[in-house]
């Protein structure tokens, strides 16, 4: 009888096991069939670390308020031209990576197309810019990563006037790069940030140098999912975040800024991916598979959602900087000079509208939490902070894809300008309406970089909404 009971219990036990297995299989199957959006975004919600702001507040503020205004602003003449030297050699290692990247091969142009052999203004003429007429073989072979440096005659002449106007102002700082004969103005609207085919070991080397050498991290602590690490431990993520949580808020913020910038760049590449490339046309659009590879919690061992939350962190930092710099731009003596008085007035009105919106954001990052300890230690930490960021900006000259290099330079300078603003509160408060030299000044280059960089971050936040909708169908 006891034996029979045991057999009955064992039979019931087996039945329960089978039933549980079926339920578990069904649960896993249901999880696999659940929206891919949940795996990417379910953890990207609520409050951000070291902040009093939540993701949902940023989404609503950006997507339905600030984003469209920023897009209109950076499309204006003042903000669409950025001066960059894309020919500087990498200062850290010998770099020939751009020669080996697919679709980035440099082919010689016919002699009559080489700049300098014809009058300097030739490439800005109507003849040289007829996009749909006699296109030579060199043009047909234009690389995805090539930077379109052509400017109209009107734009070229306007640049000279803009420079003269800037030279008459009291420049707070002058970048050596702008004075280089290799520095050229680039039309950002002609060179959108998007997928170029630049990937693999070369890009890993860039980001590895940024994270490993400039984010205050000891070599003993392994960064999760580092593709250049030969051996990976199961607990590397836990060890890394235990180390990160133990840092002072300033160093932790530095890492999260770089991670957020990295995430933003990846989002742009996924949102503007080359989906179809034929001899007839190129089709660009959202690549959900690429997005999942970078941000799906399952595919990234939980890293993806952390990266996305860091995007919101850098958004808060740059938004705070823009709100703080309002006194600089609202002075009547400040002009967004392009030579077209009517458009310049309209652009400044739009700029002030953006700045006022930024000021009225309800849950700003509190920059007073940074560098608030012992004055001597805080000063040293701030200088370390600045030097590390300068190193990162230099690494941009090692990027093998010229279009990637362009946007890397712009976005690092934009973030650097935002940090400069946050560290200059007293100087900004002491600004006056007069044209007398002041301790705080932004050059045209810094202004263009600041707002274009923030527009890129704003676009990334908006694109998350688009990807969330697309992934709900996957």
Swiss-Prot record:
Enzyme class of the recorded protein, top EC level: oxidoreductase
Cystine bridges: 40-53, 42-51, 90-398, 99-104, 99-138, 104-109, 215-248, 401-404
Pfam families named among the record's database cross-references: ERO1
GO biological process: protein folding in endoplasmic reticulum
Bilayer topology annotation: Peripheral membrane protein
Subcellular location: Endoplasmic reticulum membrane
GO molecular function: FAD binding; protein-disulfide reductase activity; thiol oxidase activity
Activity-regulation annotation: Enzyme activity is tightly regulated to prevent the accumulation of reactive oxygen species in the endoplasmic reticulum. Reversibly down-regulated by the formation of disulfide bonds between the active site Cys-99 and Cys-138, and between Cys-104 and Cys-109. Glutathione may be required to regulate its activity in the endoplasmic reticulum.
Coiled coil residues, start to end: none
Protein's UniProt keywords contain Hydrolase: no
Post-translational modification as stated in the protein's UniProt record: The Cys-99/Cys-104 and Cys-401/Cys-404 disulfide bonds constitute the redox-active center. The Cys-99/Cys-104 disulfide bond may accept electron from protein disulfide isomerase (PDI) and funnel them to the active site disulfide Cys-401/Cys-404.
Residues in the signal sequence: 1-29
Domain of life: Eukaryota
Cofactor(s) this protein cannot do without: FAD
Glycan-linked positions: 340, 391, 430
Predominant cellular place of this UniProt entry's protein: endoplasmic reticulum
Catalytic activity, EC: 1.8.4.-
Cellular compartments per GO CC: endoplasmic reticulum membrane
Sites where the protein binds FAD: 194, 196, 207, 259, 262, 294, 307
Family note: Belongs to the EROs family.
Primary role: Oxidoreductase involved in disulfide bond formation in the endoplasmic reticulum. Efficiently reoxidizes P4HB/PDI, the enzyme catalyzing protein disulfide formation, in order to allow P4HB to sustain additional rounds of disulfide formation. Following P4HB reoxidation, passes its electrons to molecular oxygen via FAD, leading to the production of reactive oxygen species (ROS) in the cell. Required for the folding of immunoglobulins.
Protein name: ERO1-like protein alpha
The species this protein was found in: Xenopus tropicalis (Western clawed frog)
């Amino acid at each position: 009888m006891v034996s029979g009971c045991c057999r009955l219990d064992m039979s019931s036990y087996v039945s329960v096991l089978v039933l549980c297995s079926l339920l578990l299989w069904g649960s896993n199957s249901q999880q696999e069939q659940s929206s891919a959006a949940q795996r990417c975004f379910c953890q990207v919600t609520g409050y951000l670390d070291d902040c009093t702001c939540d993701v949902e507040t940023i989404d609503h503020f950006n997507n339905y308020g600030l984003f469209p205004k920023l897009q209109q602003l950076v499309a204006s003449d003042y903000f669409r031209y950025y001066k960059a030297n894309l020919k500087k050699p990498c200062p850290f290692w010998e770099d020939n990576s751009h020669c080996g990247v697919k679709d980035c091969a440099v082919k010689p142009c016919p002699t009559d197309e080489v700049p300098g052999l014809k009058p300097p203004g030739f490439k800005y003429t109507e003849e040289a810019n007829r996009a749909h007429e006699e296109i030579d073989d060199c043009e047909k072979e234009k690389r995805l990563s090539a930077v379109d440096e052509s400017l109209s005659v009107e734009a070229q002449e306007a640049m000279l006037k803009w420079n003269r106007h800037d030279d008459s102002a009291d420049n707070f700082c002058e970048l050596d790069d702008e004075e280089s004969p290799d520095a050229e103005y680039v039309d950002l609207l002609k060179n959108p940030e998007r997928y170029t085919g630049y990937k693999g070991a070369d890009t890993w080397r860039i980001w590895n140098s940024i994270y490993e050498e400039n984010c205050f991290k000891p070599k003993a602590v392994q960064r999760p999912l580092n593709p250049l690490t030969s051996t990976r431990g199961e607990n590397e993520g836990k060890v890394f975040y235990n180390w990160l949580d133990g840092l002072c808020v300033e160093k932790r913020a530095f890492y999260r800024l770089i991670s957020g910038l990295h995430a933003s760049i990846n989002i742009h590449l996924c949102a503007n991916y080359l989906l179809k490339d034929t001899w007839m046309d190129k089709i660009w659009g959202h690549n959900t598979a690429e997005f999942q590879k970078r941000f799906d919690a399952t595919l990234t061992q939980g890293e993806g959602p952390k990266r996305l939350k860091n995007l919101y962190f850098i958004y808060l930092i740059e938004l705070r900087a823009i709100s703080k710099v309002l006194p600089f731009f609202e002075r009547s003596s400040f002009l967004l000079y392009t030579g077209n008085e009517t458009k310049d007035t309209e652009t400044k009105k739009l700029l002030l509208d953006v700045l006022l919106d930024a000021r009225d954001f309800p849950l700003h990052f509190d920059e007073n939490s940074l560098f608030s300890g012992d004055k001597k230690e805080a000063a040293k930490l701030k200088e370390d902070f600045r030097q590390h960021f300068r190193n990162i900006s230099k690494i941009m000259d090692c990027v093998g894809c010229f279009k990637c290099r362009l946007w890397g330079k712009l976005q690092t300078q934009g973030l650097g300008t935002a940090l400069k603003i946050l560290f200059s509160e007293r100087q900004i408060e002491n600004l006056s309406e007069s044209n007398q030299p002041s301790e705080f000044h932004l050059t045209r280059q810094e202004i263009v970089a600041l707002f274009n960089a923030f527009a890129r971050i704003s676009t990334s936040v908006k694109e998350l909404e688009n990807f969330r909708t697309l992934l709900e169908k996957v």
